[in-house]
């Protein structure tokens, strides 16, 4: 096993060195160290053993390529082979970012569903761009993500696994996350990626595993053969709409029971499609990263913040914003203050403290505020973007709303957010 010492220097391919400062963490494949690189603190992932020529060459290609998006902690430099191993340099994880697995064990919690949806959209966007670039990730699991619990900002790590689609990199994946065809010895590819993605997304929302329920509890010992079955071709989705034999246990899988009940029907049906028997056995039937992203963007438009919440902590997802709404946490009725109707027909629900996102952007441009005027409360919208908004009243008068300014919302008002996007205000 190859481990490094504080103060030790490691040579980089193409020239330069890093100096080991301290260990940050370790896993089954390697150890991550904080290092000094040209006077700046960075991270070095160092493999416990030499992973072979195929893996090394693939890592070299990744270092020389452009990351699909800023969400990827992409390999910056690769080391020379030394001390019977090698590694690569990447940026350090910023403070406030946690591994996805920390959310499963309640070491940290998401602030609200806005942050969960934001994380989900970022995950889907990242892998959509990766796949459009002709790459597959090949080893998608809960250890690949660092997430900010407050806002859902996301970083994707372990990008040494990334390889050209349908190319053998020497990596198969992690048990409980691999597609059935990979469990059976197939080469990971984009279609196996999207199956692993569905597992990750289910775990993000349910904080539980989609293939663990009453059936899997029957096994006292999970041998390799049993695991290959229950997480491979024999996998039964816990909420399968036809086969209820693997339903979550009410106590052991408490999170799954509670959170499934909070899910809107559209999200339930998406998981049933993406993780059902048809998708397990037939890769062409799987939901794509683009389909997932579009669903989460739609759910974000319809996200409701409970008026009883002091901030944004109590929010919930719905499918029909025109129906009678009740907060699942406090049980009180909720009224939508206003809708924004965009040119493409989509509607955006506004309730107090609700953030406004345009299209699939990962940056909010506004937030709904409640203010008092003439002895009554009214809903307003605050501009938090860098653009001045053009506001047209129902009578045709034009006003300009600068950054941080708030305007009361009136029925029939039209807001031009930028050169491409205009919405009409509909007061409920």
Predicted ranges, named:
Residues 2-38:
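ATP-binding glycine-rich phosphate-binding loop
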Residues 47-69:
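The N-lobe alphaC helix and its flanking beta3-alphaC-beta4 segment of protein kinase-like domains
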Residues 73-119:
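Conserved structural core of kinase catalytic domains
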Residues 127, 131-149:
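Catalytic-loop of the protein kinase fold
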Residues 168-185:
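Conserved activation segment of eukaryotic-like protein kinases, specifically the C-terminal portion
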Residues 193:
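Conserved catalytic-loop aspartate of Hanks-type protein kinases
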Residues 201-268:
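Conserved C-lobe activation region of Hanks-type protein kinase-like domains
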Residues 392-428:
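C-terminal boundary/linker segments immediately following FHA domains
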């Amino acid at each position: 096993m190859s481990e490094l010492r504080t103060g030790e220097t490691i040579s980089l391919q193409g020239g330069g060195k890093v100096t080991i400062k301290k260990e940050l963490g370790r896993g089954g494949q390697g150890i991550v160290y904080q290092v000094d690189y040209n006077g700046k603190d960075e991270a070095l992932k160092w493999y416990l053993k030499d992973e072979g020529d195929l893996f090394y060459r693939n890592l070299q290609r990744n270092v020389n390529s452009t990351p699909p998006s800023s969400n990827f902690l992409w390999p910056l430099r690769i080391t020379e082979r030394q001390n019977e191993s090698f590694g690569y340099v990447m940026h350090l994880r910023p403070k406030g970012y946690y591994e996805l697995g920390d959310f499963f064990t309640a070491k940290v919690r998401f602030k609200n569903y806005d942050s969960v949806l934001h994380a989900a959209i970022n995950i889907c966007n990242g892998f959509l761009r990766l796949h459009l670039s002709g790459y597959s990730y090949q080893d998608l699991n809960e250890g690949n993500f660092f997430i900010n619990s407050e806002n859902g900002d996301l970083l994707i790590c372990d990008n040494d696994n990334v390889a050209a689609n349908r190319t053998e990199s020497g990596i198969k994946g992690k048990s409980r996350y691999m597609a059935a065809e990979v469990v059976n010895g197939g080469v990971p590819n984009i279609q196996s990626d999207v199956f692993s993605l569905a597992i990750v997304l289910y775990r993000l929302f349910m904080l539980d595993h989609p293939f663990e329920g009453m059936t899997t509890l029957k096994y006292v010992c999970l041998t390799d053969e049993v695991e290959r079955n229950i997480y491979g071709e024999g996998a039964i989705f816990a909420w399968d709409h036809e086969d209820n034999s693997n339903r979550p246990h009410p106590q052991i899988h408490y999170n799954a029971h509670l959170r499934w009940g909070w899910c809107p029907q559209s999200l339930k049906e998406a998981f049933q499609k993406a993780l059902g028997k048809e998708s397990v056995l037939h890769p062409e039937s799987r939901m794509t990263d683009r389909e997932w992203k579009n669903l989460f963007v739609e759910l974000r438009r319809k996200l409701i913040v409970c008026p009883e919440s002091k901030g944004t902590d109590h929010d919930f997802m719905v499918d029909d914003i025109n129906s009678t709404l009740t907060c699942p946490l406090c049980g009180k009725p909720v009224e939508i203050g206003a809708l924004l109707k965009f040119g493409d027909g989509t509607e955006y629900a506004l309730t107090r403290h609700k953030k406004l996102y345009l299209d699939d952007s990962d940056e909010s441009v506004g937030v709904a505020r409640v203010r008092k005027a003439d002895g009554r409360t009214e809903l307003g919208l605050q501009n938090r973007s860098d653009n001045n908004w053009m506001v047209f009243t129902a009578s045709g008068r034009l006003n300009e709303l600068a950054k941080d300014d708030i305007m009361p919302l009136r029925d029939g008002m039209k807001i031009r957010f930028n050169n491409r996007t205009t919405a009409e205000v509909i007061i409920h």
